[in-house]
Regions:
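Extended extracellular/luminal ectodomain segments enriched in beta-structured repeat modules
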Residues: 497-498, 506-513, 558-560
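Short beta-strand-plus-loop segments that form exposed binding edges in beta-rich domains
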Residues: 565-572
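Active-site mouth of glycoside hydrolases
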Residues: 46-48, 53-227, 404, 414, ...
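Substrate-binding clefts and catalytic carboxylate motifs of secreted carbohydrate-active enzymes
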Residues: 46, 54, 58, 81, ...
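Disordered, acidic Ser/Thr/Pro-rich linker "stalks" and the adjacent N-terminal cap
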Residues: 450-506, 517-522, 542-546, 572, ...
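A short beta-strand element within beta-rich, extracytoplasmic domains
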Residues: 509-520, 564
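Secretory targeting and sorting signals
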Residues: 1-36
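Extracellular glycoside hydrolase catalytic/binding regions
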Residues: 183-296, 321
């Protein structure tokens, strides 16, 4: 059996077109169609020579997964149609789906309508159902899904039904060993039960089930004979699907329900130890390559819905979306060309041919100047505008991109201020042409605390605190961690105000600089104090607008003891410091 792919996080926040159904949910069905108007869709032909037909006519799926709000369907359907797209795919179907089906039908587009089953394909995608014993959940889905099929089967926007998404893979996040095998058998058997129920209600549309790798297909072959065809999400390995199908002895055709450029889980790490994101040109080529491999398996691969017609301008959106914030990328035009759309009169995006970080991208000092060198050209000669953004995914799983104030130094050189929080950040350059097109490239930088001049008087000295965390998460987090010179260890306090940490310098000593390297649990308000006897304190610095990261400032102080005294936490947790440096 083909081994499962490297464990991956969800590519985007699950872009369900309709809400995920849960046990006990009460949902009102929209009014049924006034009359039967749906197409009859069939998988026809014989072994190795299949085709999909709609009302008796051959139909090759030229599709994209759907990302925008259903309310925007009429806005985006004409654009999809102009790309040569004839199909979109969703992950969920419920009462909210009707406007999408109606809009699709009105524009000559059909929908692969999904039904979501837990656990889905990645951590956080859904709960861990026991498909061997949880009859309540299974009965709920067996009741709910056919209701929506009955409601929408005559809608001309429906192409087929797709039961589940990546759950054969996703079950590995819930079970292991022999129990995992039993659960996978039980899940695929349940999918077959759903397929039979759907066929009983709607014999006019095929039923499939999507998973994340071809290693799921033996389970479907064994346990789900009532599926009309298979479906798989495959990115960098999409050109290997044909070989897996041929070696597996399968007797059903398949479709690719997600594909595109190499995903985060498939690429090597860069010099900073995070996934090396392909550039815009490589991503565009990934879609072209994927479509070539789909169409190359004639009579078996019946088409694809490539990933992703989405508009999010966040970490996952930059990796995969064809039009983040409605701006079209090279990938958008690659898909349009693949599907036969007319690009002869299109104004196309700027191309970023080079993007580098000046200096050492592995040691960028927090809060200091960061200079980027960008080389971009526009095929239409348009004037270009630049924007720089950053993202903290590899620090705290943040998805948002934050625009940074920049200074254009000329000659493609842009200066911004580096983030003030240590860790590996993604830095993006966005180049727009004023005609709705964008080029985006990204690099990683490892942000480190600035190196103060002088000697760290606190390094290795005795430290005490009002409290510390003896055991939570990665703790124990004792006071000594804050003065050990190691940015990977931390002191953490109780979850209350006030809290303090102090270091004993051994003798009355003059110091001129303090550096605090905060973990995510930072101080919003605090003071730095000094004392000769540990009893009587003098304040040398007051901060009321702390935002975490690295606080690096000059002071004028003398004393044996130096204390940071937190009075207002920035989070619901305690105070946590990687390092407390006192410099003379």
């Amino acid at each position: 059996m083909t081994p499962p792919p490297r464990t991956r996080a969800r590519r985007l926040a699950a872009p369900l077109t309709a809400g995920v159904l849960t046990v006990g949910a009460l949902t009102a069905l929209p009014a049924p169609q006034a009359h039967a108007a749906g197409s009859v869709v069939k998988v026809t032909g014989a072994q190795g020579d299949w085709q999909l037909t709609v009302d008796g006519k051959p139909y090759q799926i030229k599709g994209l997964t759907w990302g925008p709000s259903i309310a925007d369907a009429d806005r985006y359907m004409p654009d999809l149609k102009s790309m040569g797209v004839n199909t979109i795919r969703t992950w969920g179907t419920d009462a909210s789906s009707k406007p999408l089906f109606d809009s699709a039908a009105a524009h000559g587009v059909k929908v692969i309508a999904g039904f979501w089953l837990q656990p889905g394909g990645g951590p956080g995608s859904g709960g861990c159902v026991n498909y061997r014993t949880d009859t309540a959940y299974k009965n709920q889905m067996l009741d709910e899904f056919p209701k929506w099929v009955q409601t929408y089967k005559d809608n001309p926007g429906v192409l087929m039904w797709d039961v589940g998404n990546e759950s054969v893979l996703g079950l590995q996040n819930c079970y292991g060993g022999a129990e995992l095998e039993r659960q996978r058998d039980a899940y695929t058997s349940f999918v077959n039960d759903v397929a039979k129920r759907i066929h009983a209600v709607d014999p006019g549309h095929p039923v499939t089930s999507t998973d994340a790798w071809v290693g799921a297909w033996p389970y479907f072959k064994k346990n789900a004979p009532d599926l009309d065809l298979y479906a798989v999400n495959s990115y960098n390995a999409v050109c290997d699907v044909r070989s897996a199908w041929e070696k597996g002895g399968y007797t059903k055709p398949y479709i690719i329900t997600e594909t595109g450029p190499a995903g985060e889980w498939e690429v090597p790490d860069d010099a900073n130890g995070v996934p090396l994101e392909p550039g815009d040109r490589a991503k565009a080529d990934g879609y072209t390559r994927a479509w070539g491999c789909v169409t190359g398996h004639r009579g078996v691969a019946l088409g694809a819905t490539m990933f992703h017609y989405g508009t999010e301008y966040d970490f996952g959106g930059i990796w995969f979306n064809l039009l983040p914030a409605g701006q079209k990328r090279l990938s958008y035009y690659a898909v349009k060309r693949a599907y036969g759309g007319d690009t002869s009169h299109d104004n196309t995006p700027p191309a970023v041919s080079d993007f580098t970080v000046e200096g050492d991208a592995g040691r960028v000092q927090a809060g200091r100047d960061l200079t980027l060198a960008v080389r971009a050209t526009d095929p239409d000669g348009d004037a270009l505008s630049y924007e720089v953004l950053d993202n903290s995914m590899y620090i705290d799983k943040g998805k948002d991109l934050t625009p940074l104030p920049l200074t254009d130094l000329g000659g493609g050189r842009l200066r911004v201020t580096a983030p003030d929080r240590p860790g590996v950040w993604k830095v993006y350059v966005k180049v727009t042409d004023g005609h709705g097109n964008v080029g985006v490239e990204t690099r990683s930088v490892r942000v480190v605390p600035p190196t103060p001049s002088g000697t760290n008087l606190a390094l290795g000295r005795p430290a005490t605190a009002s409290s510390y965390q003896p055991g939570y998460g990665d703790c124990p987090c004792p006071t000594a961690n804050a003065v050990d010179g190691n940015q990977n260890t931390r002191w953490a306090s109780d979850w209350s105000d006030p809290q303090w940490l102090q270091v004993d310098l051994g003798a009355r000593t003059a110091f001129r600089h303090v550096q605090l390297v905060w973990e995510a649990s930072y101080a919003k308000a605090y003071t730095v104090r000094t004392s000769d006897d540990g009893q009587n304190w003098r304040t040398v610095r007051t901060v009321t607008d702390g935002n975490g990261g690295v606080d690096d400032f000059d002071v004028t102080g003398t004393g044996r003891y130096v204390r940071v005294n937190g009075t207002a936490r920035g989070t619901g947790y305690g105070y946590s410091l990687y390092e407390f440096g006192v410099y003379g």
